[in-house]
């Protein structure tokens, strides 16, 4: 099964916890703190595997979690850093943040890799909190939480040449004739349901990858037929071979086919029409094809969608007539055409500053009167607080006070004994 789009969840490893420990050695009185730091959590890394062809494996595993770092130890020993979690994807995979659609990475080269979620840093041991006022602190940090995010993977086949056209115009027949690929061929529309790839090898030693893309119909960019689910694969191609059935047996005129397919490509992404395009006038072995081709050349003069009039090659994929000059010209055109970069989502280039600091925490009250504290910064500070040591809790209380949490609770009417909740931790408010 060919799978080219999937949504998954990734979670990097948490940092290891710092340790509260003291140096206990013979003849060393008052040895002082000796708790080590936690190790860094593992990253989640995507790498290219040239042996993969689809994203099918992700249908069965949608959550990936890296290991956490090791905890700090006595004698100021740092915990072991966790190994990265490596996720293999096919060449040509684009990785995007599912929430913002921001491109995280575009893995097109065999050795490409990208970190999609960073592991948390290790928490500090009590050796970092010693001071003249508190030479033996019982304070240590928990590890920083690792990043977690929803990401979307899109596979865009890496082909130099893309075959586009209405269903049953002969794309699969052409691919099977000029390559060793064996796509399904039958006398009905939408025989091809997934992209098929083949390698074209010319006698002069040149070669290129050709992709047979499922047939488009009018309205495909808006979801009609197979919709635009395979139009994304055209984005990777450098040259487009636009196959047109010159026989007219489908009841459509060749120029109408040409115009409608290009309109669909323009609706999906206007930049696709900037790619070199060759018109492949197929089925020239049929009775009325020569007459239809002559009319098509006349009609083509009125085309306004393409920047320049495309070259036309009359062929018969069935009898192999005309294929050699078509492939030679395609190879020449590839040599003249650079790679097209992945299209990034448009973002604002001008930032507006209103000089209002971002809120460090949020405060709400639920139905039973419990005060709920939230906010990324505050929750992160709490998760890095070792609640098993009183001094760590007192330090967290000072941090909240410095952020203005106490003042905010008081202003909102909190009273002594009210319950306050942060994440999964509940305590009583003391004014």
UniProtKB/Swiss-Prot annotation:
Query: PROSITE patterns under this entry?
Result: G_OBG (PS51710), GTP1_OBG (PS00905), OBG (PS51883), OCT (PS51881)
Described function? An essential GTPase which binds GTP, GDP and possibly (p)ppGpp with moderate affinity, with high nucleotide exchange rates and a fairly low GTP hydrolysis rate. Plays a role in control of the cell cycle, stress response, ribosome biogenesis and in those bacteria that undergo differentiation, in morphogenesis control.
Gene3D superfamilies tied to this protein: GTP-binding protein OBG, C-terminal domain, GTP1/OBG domain, P-loop containing nucleotide triphosphate hydrolases
Record-listed E.C. numbers: 3.6.5.-
- Report the source organism: Levilactobacillus brevis (strain ATCC 367 / BCRC 12310 / CIP 105137 / JCM 1170 / LMG 11437 / NCIMB 947 / NCTC 947) (Lactobacillus brevis)
The record's SUPFAM superfamilies line, in alphabetical order, gives: Obg GTP-binding protein C-terminal domain, Obg GTP-binding protein N-terminal domain, P-loop containing nucleoside triphosphate hydrolases
Keywords (alphabetical) are:
Cytoplasm, GTP-binding, Hydrolase, Magnesium, Metal-binding, Nucleotide-binding
Q: Which HAMAP family match?
A: GTPase_Obg
Disordered: region residues = 125-145
Designated name of the protein: GTPase Obg
Family per record: Belongs to the TRAFAC class OBG-HflX-like GTPase superfamily. OBG GTPase family.
List the cofactors: Mg(2+)
Q: Does the entry feature the keyword Amino-acid biosynthesis, yes or no?
A: no
Q: Please tell me where Mg(2+) binds in this chain.
A: 172, 192
Chief site of localization = cytoplasm
- Record-level GO BP terms: ribosome biogenesis
Give residue ranges for domain OBG-type G.
Answer: 159-335
Entry binding sites for GTP: 165-172, 190-194, 212-215, 282-285, 316-318
Obg domain boundaries? 1-158
Q: Which residues form the OCT domain?
A: 353-431
Q: Which GO terms describe its molecular function?
A: GTP binding; GTPase activity; magnesium ion binding
Q: Which gene encodes it?
A: obg
Q: Which GO terms describe its cellular component?
A: cytoplasm
Q: Which PANTHER family match?
A: DEVELOPMENTALLY REGULATED GTP-BINDING PROTEIN-RELATED (PTHR11702), MITOCHONDRIAL RIBOSOME-ASSOCIATED GTPASE 2 (PTHR11702:SF31)
Q: Where are the transmembrane segments?
A: none
């Amino acid at each position: 099964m060919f799978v080219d789009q999937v949504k998954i969840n990734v979670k990097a490893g948490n940092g290891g916890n710092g340790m509260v420990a003291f140096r206990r050695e013979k003849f060393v009185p008052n040895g002082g703190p000796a708790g080590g730091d936690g190790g860094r959590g593992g990253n989640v890394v995507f790498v290219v595997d040239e042996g993969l062809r689809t994203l099918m494996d992700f249908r069965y595993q949608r959550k990936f979690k890296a290991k956490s770092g090791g905890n700090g130890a006595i004698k100021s020993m740092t915990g072991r850093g966790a190994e990265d979690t490596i996720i293999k994807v096919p060449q040509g995979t684009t990785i995007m943040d599912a929430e913002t659609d921001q491109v995280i990475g575009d893995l097109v080269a065999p050795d490409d890799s990208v970190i999609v979620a960073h592991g948390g840093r290790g928490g500090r041991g009590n050796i970092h909190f010693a001071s003249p006022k508190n030479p033996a602190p019982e304070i240590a940090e928990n590890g920083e939480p690792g990043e977690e995010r929803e990401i979307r993977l899109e596979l865009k086949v890496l082909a130099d040449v893309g075959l586009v056209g209405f269903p049953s115009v002969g794309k699969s027949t052409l691919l099977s004739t000029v390559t060793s690929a064996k796509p399904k061929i039958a006398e009905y529309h939408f025989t091809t349901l997934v992209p098929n790839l083949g390698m074209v090898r010319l006698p002069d030693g040149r070669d290129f990858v050709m992709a047979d893309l499922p047939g488009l119909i009018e309205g495909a960019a808006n979801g009609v037929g197979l919709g635009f689910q395979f139009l994304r694969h055209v984005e990777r191609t450098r040259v487009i071979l636009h196959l047109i059935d010159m026989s007219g047996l489908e009841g459509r005129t060749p120029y109408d086919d040409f115009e409608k397919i290009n309109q669909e490509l323009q609706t999906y992404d206007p930049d696709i029409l900037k790619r070199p395009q060759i018109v492949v006038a197929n089925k020239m072995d049929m009775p009325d094809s020569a007459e239809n081709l002559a009319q098509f050349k006349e009609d083509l003069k009125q085309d306004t969608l393409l920047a320049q009039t495309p070259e036309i090659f009359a062929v018969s994929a069935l009898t192999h007539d005309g294929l050699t000059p078509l492939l030679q010209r395609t190879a020449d055109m590839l040599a003249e055409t650079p790679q097209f970069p992945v299209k990034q989502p448009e973002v604002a280039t001008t930032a507006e500053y209103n000089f209002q600091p971002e809120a460090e925490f949020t405060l709400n009250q639920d139905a039973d009167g419990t005060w709920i504290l939230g906010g990324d910064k505050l929750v992160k500070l709490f998760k890095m607080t070792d609640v098993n040591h009183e001094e760590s809790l007192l330090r967290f209380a000072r941090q909240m006070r410095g952020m203005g949490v106490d003042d905010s609770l008081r202003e909102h009417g909190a009273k002594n004994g009210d319950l306050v909740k942060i994440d999964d931790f509940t305590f009583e408010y003391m004014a």
